[in-house]
Design a protein with these regions (language model features):
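Class I SAM-dependent methyltransferase SAM/SAH-binding core
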Residues: 41-82
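A short acidic, Gly/Pro-enriched loop at the edge of an enzyme's catalytic core
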Residues: 84-93
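Conserved class I S-adenosyl-L-methionine
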Residues: 1-32, 43-47, 63-66, 124-150, 195
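A short SAM/SAH-binding and catalytic strip from SAM-dependent methyltransferases
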Residues: 93-105
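A short glycine-rich, Lys/Arg-flanked "PGG" loop and its adjoining helix->strand segment in the class I
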Residues: 107-122
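Short alpha-helix
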Residues: 161-179, 184
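A C-terminal cap/extension of S-adenosyl-L-methionine-dependent methyltransferases
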Residues: 183-240
Length: 272
């Protein structure tokens, strides 16, 4: 494994700026026990490892072989199976960036996140935003066919990872009612609109772009068209009530009507 020190200049400019924006949005995290799930080559795990106890989980052995190791963190190879090895309420913070779109068992993964997360612990999820992808297809790639396909609710495609299975921000709360979205921010609202690739390399331009991206990231009208959403979720102590799975039986409805007619405050009891 290459133990040479690496920094963000080793990444393409768009990826370097994406990391910096996400890290700024995360704020200063210290002295926390963290999982980075789907850690890739470990750029974020390495960054957080400087001041935290970090465990990175990644299924791709090639990515693990190329991982960044400037700072100390524990690397595990695997997926949701590795999450199941941890006891309940073990971690303070979970990182999951651009991962759930590429999995079929994402609801199970999110529920495992909640299980291993301490009460009031937080999860950082970066996810694709369908509207932003439509913008990309039309403005940058001139691909109207794919834009129409996305607007019709179909999946997208990433050259490196395959099908992008889009989901809505609120789906996460539906998969696991213990989790509540406390913050939503946009990412890459303007960054990719600049098609002059040479200017992307200009450090001064990068700083100005990051500044304006951060400024609009909390504004809903810009979040709506951002390429990505950055969600912060918190584990609550109280589970929210789930909607009923079936409609009330005809017998219950009849008894409710009878109770109303008699003007009585009758407590209904379902009979099997």
């Amino acid at each position: 494994m290459n133990k040479m020190s690496k920094n963000l200049t080793a990444l393409p400019p768009w990826e370097s700026m994406l990391k910096r924006i996400v890290w700024k949005q995360l704020g200063d995290i210290r002295n926390k026990k963290i999982i980075d799930f789907g850690s890739g080559i470990g750029v974020t795990a390495d960054y957080l490892g400087k001041n935290n106890d970090v465990i990175a989980i990644e299924p791709n052995e090639g990515s693990v072989a190329a991982r960044w190791t400037n700072n100390q963190y524990m690397q595990m190879i695997g997926s949701v199976d590795r999450l199941r090895e941890f006891a309940d309420e073990t971690f303070d913070f979970i990182i999951c960036h651009n991962v759930l779109e590429y999995t079929e068992d994402r609801a199970d993964i999110v529920r495992e996140f909640a299980r291993v997360l301490k009460p009031h612990g937080k999860i950082s999820i970066v996810k694709h935003n369908r509207a932003g992808r439509v913008m990309q297809m039309i403005v940058l790639l001139n691909d109207f066919e794919k834009a129409h396909s996305l607007l019709s609710g179909n999946d997208g495609m990433a050259s490196k990872y395959g099908a992008i299975h889009y989901y809505e921000d609120a789906d996460i709360e539906n998969w696991c009612p213990e989790l509540t979205i406390t913050q939503t921010r946009g990412i890459r609202t303007f960054l990719d609109m600049q098609q002059n690739q040479e200017i992307h390399k200009d450090v001064g331009w990068q700083e100005k772009m990051i500044e304006i991206e951060m400024r609009v990231s909390d504004m809903k009208e810009y979040q709506d068209i951002a390429f990505f959403h950055h969600l912060i979720l918190e584990k609550t102590n109280k589970k929210r009530a789930m909607p009923p799975l079936t409609k009330p039986s005809i017998h219950v409805k009849m008894r409710e009507t009878l109770s109303e007619r008699q003007g009585q405050n009758v407590k209904l009891e379902d009979k099997k």
